[in-house]
Amino acid sequence: MAWRNPMNTLISLLLLTLIMLAGPAVIALWYFRGRQV
């Protein structure tokens, strides 16, 4: 995976990490909100 612009790779990795972290975070938030009500 050789990109011309190294920033593109960095941004792609950041987005991938954000998505992987956001998935469980959203599920946890939704789960705790459901328990409180």
UniProtKB/Swiss-Prot annotation:
Source superkingdom: Bacteria
Swiss-Prot/TrEMBL keywords: Cell inner membrane, Cell membrane, Membrane, Photosynthesis, Photosystem II, Transmembrane, Transmembrane helix
Record has DNA repair as a keyword: no
Oligomeric and partner information: PSII is composed of 1 copy each of membrane proteins PsbA, PsbB, PsbC, PsbD, PsbE, PsbF, PsbH, PsbI, PsbJ, PsbK, PsbL, PsbM, PsbT, PsbX, Psb30/Ycf12, peripheral proteins PsbO, CyanoQ (PsbQ), PsbU, PsbV and a large number of cofactors. It forms dimeric complexes.
NCBIfam families, sorted: PRK13686.1
Similarity remark: Belongs to the Psb30/Ycf12 family.
UniProt-recorded name of the protein: Photosystem II reaction center protein Psb30
Species whose genome carries this gene: Gloeobacter violaceus (strain ATCC 29082 / PCC 7421)
